[in-house]
Regions:
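Helical "lid/coupling" subdomains associated with nucleotide-phosphate turnover
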Residues: 3-4, 8-37, 47-97, 112-115, ...
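Conserved beta-strand/loop subsegment of P-loop NTPase cores
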Residues: 40-44
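Short glycine-aspartate micro-motif
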Residues: 98-102
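Short, basic and Ser/Thr-rich N-terminal targeting/leader segments
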Residues: 104-106, 175
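Acidic, divalent-metal-coordinating active-site segment for phosphoryl/phosphodiester hydrolysis
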Residues: 106-112
Length: 274
């Protein structure tokens, strides 16, 4: 469920009431499903949008009161560590220098690692919801708007490269909805099959081709592309642009897709503590 909890954060600095309501409805539905299936223990975390929002703690309080779900707001260091746990669960790193690209709605994280040890981290405000709100207003895409988005990404990614110093990745891994959607589109995987998505690889040329096709389409035409999840039809442009410009900035010809990420990292942490 794509509820766009971080919508409006750039301009308001807080979670929008309607998006909080949408998210609370989804959480309530999740809670009901759990109650109908033996009431297993729940572990919920919040990241960028709730972490940064002036009313983030209000949202957490409401979630507890209205749904019974305890949400923990985790710092970026813990988010990065748990994300890597999930990513490397089924993708061997072979002691290579890796950049893991985690694209969210409010932010995008760049996690540097070698031998599963984090050697660097950079969190940016390059989230797909934020970028779409700021740069994209027309579908099919207006080229002037897209050029502004592209220039912004290139500028921000140069700052990321500078912060990460001389780190040169041997492997680029992508996680979250944008990259899994790109893999599904490239390989025409429908219905969605996580086992076919995980560890799949697409090239810079693949990303360029998919982006060019998406830019020409209206929102309804994109939705007709079955692998594309409803609610992602406008966000996929900014997401694909992030992927493509990252590949260019770090001179990576391919990206390996991880179906597993923060959620699986949390599960592994729980299992390992038993």
């Amino acid at each position: 469920n794509i509820t766009r909890l971080g919508e409006g954060m750039d301009t308001q600095g807080k979670l929008a009431k309607n998006r909080m309501e949408d998210t609370l409805q989804v959480l309530a539905a999740f809670r009901q499903t759990c109650l109908e299936n033996g009431d297993p223990p729940l572990f919920a975390v919040a990241t960028s949008a709730v972490r940064e929002a002036s009313n983030g703690h209000e949202f957490v309080h409401r979630a507890k009161k209205e749904t019974g779900i305890d949400i923990k707001i985790i710092p970026w260091e813990e988010e990065a560590r748990l994300t890597l746990e999930g990513v490397f669960w089924k993708i061997p790193d072979n002691n290579r220098k890796v950049i893991t690209l985690d694209i969210g709605g409010g932010s995008t994280e760049f996690i540097l690692s070698q031998g599963k040890e984090i050697s660097g981290f950079c969190s940016t405000s390059l989230g797909v919801v934020r970028l779409t709100e700021k740069f994209i207003s027309r579908h099919p895409i207006d080229e002037k708007e897209f050029l502004s988005l592209k220039n912004h990404l290139q500028k921000e990614l140069q700052a990321v490269k500078k912060k990460l110093s001389t780190f040169r990745p041997e492997l680029l891994i992508g996680t979250a909805g944008t990259v899994t959607t790109l893999s599904a589109l490239k390989n025409n995987i429908y219905p969605y099959d996580p086992e076919k998505i995980h560890a799949s690889v697409f090239s810079r040329e693949d990303a360029e081709s998919i982006l060019a096709d998406l830019k020409r389409k209206s929102l309804s035409e994109r939705l007709a592309m079955k692998p594309l999840e409803p609610g992602r039809e406008d966000l996929i442009i900014a997401g694909t642009a992030i992927v493509l410009e990252t590949m260019r900035a770090f001179d990576c010809e391919t990206l390996t897709v991880s179906e597993y990420s923060l959620r699986e990292g949390i599960i592994l942490k729980i299992v390992n503590s038993i």
